[in-house]
Amino acid sequence: MIFIDNRQNKFEVTEELTKKLEEVISFVLKEEKVKEDCEVSLVFVDNEEIRGINNETRGIDRATDVLSFPMIDYPEDKVYKDVYLEHEFDKCYFDGDELILGDIVLSLERTKEQSIEFNHSFEREACYLVTHSVLHLLGYDHMEEEEKARMRGREEELLGKLNITRES
């Protein structure tokens, strides 16, 4: 299940947008071979709120586009499909029958700014950032160049399969 929580009032959150982002989340989980029913929270905020969260959780006092809060730990250089395909999780990882993957906090304000900066649509930028964040929930990272290349390649591959291009 995907929970949507709109905590900002600067941008209208349309049913079309939420449906598209839910589709992206579900698609990424399927493509990454996640077989369990999962719970993901997607929270929409503005730059002020994400700046506060970023400062509180990472010690970085500036707005960012998206933050990911995975509930599952991953060994270094491993992602969900490398480690957990046949794994039986303890009950503490579940809410009812759903595996809790984690939370995505998305600044719609920053999303709009970046869509203008990168000269593509707001929807494309939102889909990219949600794809990026779901991959973080599944263990992908971009702290090292090799990890970054792997993650960027996977993002582009997934968005391509969804026909979400930079021209979108």
UniProtKB/Swiss-Prot annotation:
Its cofactor is Zn(2+). Gene3D superfamilies: Metalloproteases ('zincins'), catalytic domain. Binds 1 zinc ion. Its EC number is 3.1.-.-. It comes from Clostridium perfringens (strain ATCC 13124 / DSM 756 / JCM 1290 / NCIMB 6125 / NCTC 8237 / Type A). This is Endoribonuclease YbeY. GO terms for cellular component: cytoplasm. One of its GO terms (molecular function) is zinc ion binding. The keyword Zinc applies. PANTHER family: ENDORIBONUCLEASE YBEY, CHLOROPLASTIC. Zn(2+) binds at residues 132, 136, 142.
